[in-house]
């Protein structure tokens, strides 16, 4: 879908791309090679730029230490830090996380909670690493590695994503 819309359709219809607030490609890699092959596309460089792609993949320290194979992490991947909106390895503590969406096992309802979801980009891998108190995907180690949080790419940073969508929409409206 990313290829179909961003790379092909927007290339042929720049008038639609110009009206795009942002494309959140969550949990799937966007690479430097993708951007070089499609110069009409821009990756986000901050928290309120518009007409950009926002992408990340979240892993735990074990995947980094083991250099684990992960089906959604491609060579030359780029991620943006959801807590400080930087592309480098500047650490963002969990105190910058506005809240994770988790299941309360007692009520069987989802709720916003602090689970210690910090974030730091690992530039050479193109992922976010977190020390969150969160269960990694299980039963798919051969596909995602032993500590993939592919299942938490949204939920770990849920309120930061909501806040960011509002900021980007406001920036877009202001620019019109």
Which functions belong to the PLM regions below?
Residues 1-4:
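Glycine-rich nucleophile elbow surrounding the catalytic serine of serine-hydrolase chemistry
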Residues 7-157, 162, 166, 171, ...:
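Surface cap/lid and interfacial helix-loop subdomains adjacent to catalytic sites
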């Amino acid at each position: 879908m990313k290829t179909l819309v961003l790379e092909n359709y927007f290339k042929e219809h720049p008038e639609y791309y110009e009206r795009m607030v942002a494309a959140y490609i969550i949990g799937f890699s966007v690479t430097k090679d993708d951007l070089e092959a499609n110069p009409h596309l821009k990756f986000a460089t901050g928290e309120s730029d518009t007409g950009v792609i926002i992408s990340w993949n979240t892993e735990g320290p074990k995947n980094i230490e083991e250099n684990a194979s992960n089906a959604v992490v491609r060579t030359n991947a780029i991620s943006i830090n959801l807590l400080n909106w930087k592309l480098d390895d500047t650490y963002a503590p969990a105190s910058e996380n506005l809240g994770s969406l988790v299941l309360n096992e007692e009520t069987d309802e989802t709720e916003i909670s602090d689970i210690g979801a910090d974030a730091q980009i690992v530039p050479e891998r193109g992922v976010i690493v977190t020390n969150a108190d969160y269960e990694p995907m299980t039963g798919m180690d051969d596909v995602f590695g032993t500590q993939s949080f592919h299942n938490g790419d949204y939920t770990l940073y849920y309120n930061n994503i909501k806040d960011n969508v509002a900021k980007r929409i406001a920036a877009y409206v202001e620019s019109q």
